[in-house]
């Protein structure tokens, strides 16, 4: 998707739809901002992390735009997984998580909260953002 860049050019696939460049740039800026802020405020005991869903979370917006068909779509991720990832990042010691840019199932699997995962950050063909690499 647009959140993860197209990789190194030149590009041969001219069928890619437009509109993702600004979205992807904003996501990249948010990831870099989060890491910079984490470094600046860690001395005050403040942790800053950034987490994205490994798969599309079924919401009225993602259903409307046909990214998923509904709550039971196998391409989608349960909102519970995002909630668990946020809980993990808030409850683990700051030294283990501050400055992390990660995906929900990636971090849950890494810390043993789930045994299986799928999607960005977990599947070998979907590594995610360069900032999220372990």
Annotate each language-model stretch with its function.
Residues 1-43, 53-57:
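Catalytic loop of short-chain dehydrogenase/reductase
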Residues 46, 52-66:
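Short beta-loop-alpha junction of Rossmann-like oxidoreductase domains
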Residues 12-15, 62-71:
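Short glycine/proline- and charge-enriched loop/turn segments
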Residues 22-26, 63-65, 76-80:
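Short linear motifs at secondary-structure transitions and domain/linker junctions
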Residues 16, 59-62, 110-112:
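Generic domain-boundary/flexible-linker signal
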């Amino acid at each position: 998707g647009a959140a993860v860049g197209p990789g190194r050019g030149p590009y041969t696939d001219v069928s890619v739809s437009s509109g993702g460049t600004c979205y992807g740039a904003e996501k990249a800026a948010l990831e870099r901002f989060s890491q910079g802020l984490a470094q600046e405020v860690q001395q005050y005991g403040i942790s800053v992390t950034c987490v994205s869903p490994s798969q599309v979370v079924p919401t009225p917006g993602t259903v409307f735009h046909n990214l998923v068909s509904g709550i039971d779509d196998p391409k989608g991720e349960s909102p519970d997984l995002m909630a668990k990832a946020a809980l993990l990042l808030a409850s683990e010691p700051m030294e283990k998580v501050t400055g992390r840019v990660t995906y929900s199932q990636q971090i849950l699997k890494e810390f043993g909260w789930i045994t299986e995962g799928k999607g960005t950050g977990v599947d070998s063909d979907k590594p995610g953002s360069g900032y999220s690499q372990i």
